[in-house]
Amino acid sequence: MNYLILISFALLVITGVESARDAYIAKPHNCVYECFDAFSSYCNGVCTKNGAKSGYCQILGTYGNGCWCIALPDNVPIRIPGKCHR
């Protein structure tokens, strides 16, 4: 049993674990990148520049009109619940 756990852990370390998430990309102070045109390429540019596969402007979303990114890397900050401190 211990060998199975050790081998599983070694495989995780060797292959690396990468994950991505779909979320609002955040500026410093937990603020979203605001957008006003759902058909603009602004959000796609912001998202792909930060390593996401794509992005779009989500109109009237949870945090207002903000950029929503698809497959955003874990090292990029996302909007979390709480206030935007500008």
UniProtKB/Swiss-Prot annotation:
Record propeptide residues: 86
Keyword annotations: Antimicrobial, Disulfide bond, Ion channel impairing toxin, Neurotoxin, Secreted, Signal, Toxin, Voltage-gated sodium channel impairing toxin
S-S bridge residues: C31-C84, C35-C57, C43-C67, C47-C69
Record bears the keyword rRNA-binding: no
Signal peptide (UniProt feature, chain positions): 1-19
GO terms of biological process kind: defense response
GO MF term set: sodium channel inhibitor activity; toxin activity
Matches recorded under InterPro entries: LCN-type_CS_alpha_beta_dom, Scorpion_toxin-like, Scorpion_toxin-like_sf, Scorpion_toxinL, Scorpion_toxinL/defensin
Described purpose of this protein according to its UniProt entry: Alpha toxins bind voltage-independently at site-3 of sodium channels (Nav) and inhibit the inactivation of the activated channels, thereby blocking neuronal transmission. This toxin inhibits inactivation of Nav1.6/SCN8A (EC(50)=790 nM) and drosophila DmNav1 (EC(50)=280 nM). The toxin (1 uM) does not significantly shift the midpoint of activation at the two channels, but induces a significant depolarizing shift in the V(1/2) of inactivation of the channels. Has antimicrobial activity.
Assigned protein family: Belongs to the long (4 C-C) scorpion toxin superfamily. Sodium channel inhibitor family. Alpha subfamily.
Record's protein name: Sodium channel neurotoxin MeuNaTxalpha-5
